[in-house]
């Protein structure tokens, strides 16, 4: 299976290997994700429910898409902000982070490698769903694993559609 994944990642640029921020090379705690937004949508909604398309049950398909579309948009919004933050001069690294148990996940860990500053962001479609105390707990879990990233000037915050 490794050869096929390598071709899809390196030759076709169809998928991307995503590892938690600051994981050591060779870690097995990585995920492969479809890198193209169109193909992510296609495989998540159209291909998965192709039987509805073939039966011309478009109303049912639309209902299923609407039910899960916010989750799809959430991952797309994370991708947008990761790209946008790296285009600016503030950060040289931006990645997701999660622990092995899956209990803690931080949407964006952004670092400026020149200054050493590390900021943590939660990405939400609906800003009302942001819980700063919950994010602080996740950041503490991150800092227990990576104590060298602890800084007084680190920022914890929210990125939402309003920040686009």
Task: Enumerate the predicted regions with their spans.
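A cross-kingdom feature that marks ATP-driven nucleic-acid transaction machinery
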Residues: 7, 21-164
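Short amphipathic alpha-helical interaction segments
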Residues: 1-16
């Amino acid at each position: 299976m490794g050869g096929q994944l390598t071709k899809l990642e390196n030759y076709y640029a169809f998928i991307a290997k995503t590892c938690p921020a600051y994981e050591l090379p060779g870690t097995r705690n990585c995920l492969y994700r479809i890198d193209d937004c169109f193909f992510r949508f296609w495989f998540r909604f159209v291909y998965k429910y192709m039987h509805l398309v073939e039966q011309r049950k478009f109303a049912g398909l639309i209902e299923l898409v609407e039910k899960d579309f916010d989750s799809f948009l959430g991952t797309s919004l994370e991708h947008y902000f990761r790209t946008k933050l790296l285009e600016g001069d503030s950060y040289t690294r931006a990645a997701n982070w999660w622990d092995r148990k899956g209990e803690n996940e931080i949407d964006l860990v952004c670092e400026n490698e020149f200054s050493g500053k590390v900021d943590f962001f939660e990405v939400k479609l609906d800003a009302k769903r942001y819980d700063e105390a919950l994010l602080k707990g996740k950041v503490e879990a991150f800092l227990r694993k990576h104590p060298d990233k602890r800084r007084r000037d680190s920022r914890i915050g929210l990125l939402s559609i309003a920040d686009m």
